[in-house]
């Protein structure tokens, strides 16, 4: 991944792995919409790699497509965004209690290779810009050495409204 242009201080090669317990503390998504199983190579304010193990038991495979299961491209982009939210939450030390990270925009989305049951998606996300509570990212989802999807996207931290 290339060097990020961020306004936050950059950490020097601080790598960390993030397990599912911490992911559940960092983002509000739950089954059937939690699309990150673990994260690796976390560098504060810079980058992260999310991992999604795709199984035939995913609910979307029931209708997309019967007899030819393919993960919907928009869900691959969502998985990239969730990976970015984990990076953002950990970098800003935001827990889900009282705050939510919202997906703001997606640009230049491209879908290259289908993702099928049994695939492991490696979601490489890097910060391209950060200001206060808004981050911009570039993400690439890979299966093996093939690019499945890529996009640029943005997210922001907001107070969770009381219902």
Swiss-Prot record:
Q: Which family does it belong to?
A: Belongs to the thioester dehydratase family. FabZ subfamily.
Q: Which reaction does it catalyse?
A: a (3R)-hydroxyacyl-[ACP] = a (2E)-enoyl-[ACP] + H2O
EC number(s): the record gives: 4.2.1.59
PANTHER family in UniProt:
3-HYDROXYACYL-[ACYL-CARRIER-PROTEIN] DEHYDRATASE (PTHR30272:SF1)
* Record-level Gene Ontology MF annotations: (3R)-hydroxyacyl-[acyl-carrier-protein] dehydratase activity
UniProt key word Cytoplasm = yes
Catalytic residues identified in the record: 64
**CC terms in the record's Gene Ontology section:** cytoplasm; membrane
Would you indicate the residue range of the signal peptide?
A: none
Biological process per Gene Ontology, one example term: lipid A biosynthetic process
Checking NCBIfam families in the record gives: fabZ, PRK00006.1
Q: Which Pfam families match?
A: FabA
- Source organism of the structure: Caulobacter sp. (strain K31)
| Known function | Involved in unsaturated fatty acids biosynthesis. Catalyzes the dehydration of short chain beta-hydroxyacyl-ACPs and long chain saturated and unsaturated beta-hydroxyacyl-ACPs.
Name of the protein described by the UniProt record = 3-hydroxyacyl-[acyl-carrier-protein] dehydratase FabZ
Compartment list: Cytoplasm
Write out the entry's keywords from A to Z: Cytoplasm, Lipid A biosynthesis, Lipid biosynthesis, Lipid metabolism, Lyase
- The answer to whether keyword Transport applies is no
